[in-house]
UniProtKB/Swiss-Prot annotation:
InterPro entries: Ribosomal_uS2, Ribosomal_uS2_bac/mit/plastid, Ribosomal_uS2_CS, Ribosomal_uS2_flav_dom_sf. Residues 228-241 have a biased composition (Basic and acidic residues). GO terms for cellular component: cytosolic small ribosomal subunit. It comes from Syntrophus aciditrophicus (strain SB). This is Small ribosomal subunit protein uS2. Pfam families: Ribosomal_S2 (PF00318).
Length: 277
């Protein structure tokens, strides 16, 4: 059974591309035709390509990797925030900071600063500062939350990116390619698909289309996490079972050397009696 159906894609308007005079010729293989000067995307390909990307997300997360959700255009901001938050993944839905991937060491310092500000405001230790300085710290905190709030819990680089409109998010695409981080993207008829590892041909402007893909990938993340936890539990159980078997095969291994056996105590007592005689 397909993870996403043709009916869902049609209802979300995924098949509508851009006007025929605003296209990228490299998207020709994914175009079904044109109607009223609007390109129509071949949804048969979308279904198959989406399935590949969906499985990739599950596999990546099941190995402990994170998927960064990215979509800064107005139509995508809510879906990116809601779905990434639902599945516990990092996201960027406001502005992409240059170097967010390629200069993560510096970005991490800003995240640490945000965590510090959160802490002093939450435990009220900020009251030790002058009132004017508190206002400045509050403004700094709000600014950092806006651009870094979605990646505040990110400890290292993501294993892959999910991008809405790679044409808009060119900096993110370039940074990911430089670091060889795989990219999944909703690619409209005006986009260049060359730098995208997992192409999802579709409308990247319709809110319903963005919501559909974002929610499906969030589901894939959730499934990947379930498999990851299941694998960890299986490894823990295996280690425990192995330890139990070893103890059963060699029960004396657990007896501390400092504890004397009854036989050794008895032998020592007999020796003392012989000496006294």
């Amino acid at each position: 059974m397909a993870i996403i159906s043709m009916k869902q894609l049609l209802e979300a308007g995924v098949h509508f591309g851009h006007q025929t005079n605003k296209w990228n010729p490299k998207m020709k293989p994914y175009i079904f035709g044109a109607r009223n000067n609007i390109y129509i995307i071949d949804l048969q390909q979308t279904v198959g390509l989406f399935q590949n990307a969906y499985n990739f997300v599950i596999d990546t997360v099941s190995e402990g990797g994170e998927i960064m959700f990215i979509g800064t255009k107005k139509q995508s901001q809510d879906s990116i925030h809601d779905e990434a938050t639902r599945c516990g993944m990092p996201y960027v839905n406001q502005r992409w900071l240059g170097g967010m991937l390629t200069n993560f060491v510096t970005i991490k310092k800003r995240i640490d600063r945000l965590n510090y500000l959160d802490q002093i405001f939450e435990d009220d230790s900020v009251r030790a500062f002058p009132k004017k300085e508190i206002m400045g710290l509050q403004k700094e905190r709000e600014k950092l939350v806006k651009v870094l709030g979605g990646i505040q819990k990110m400890k290292s680089l993501p294993a892959a990116l999910f991008i809405v409109d790679p044409k808009r998010e060119t900096i993110a695409v370039n940074e990911a390619k430089k670091l060889r981080i795989p990219i999944i993207a909703i690619v409209d008829t005006n986009c260049d698909p060359e730098n995208i590892d997992y192409i999802i041909p579709g409308n990247d402007d319709a809110i319903r289309a963005i919501k559909l893909f974002s929610s499906k990938f969030a589901d894939a993340v959730t499934e990947g996490k379930r498999r990851y936890e299941e694998r960890l539990q299986a490894e823990t159980d295996k280690d425990a079972e192995s330890s139990t078997v070893q103890q059963e095969e060699n029960p004396e291994a657990d007896i501390p050397e400092s504890i004397e056996t009854k036989e050794s105590v008895s032998a020592a007592a007999d020796s003392d009696l012989d000496e006294n005689e």
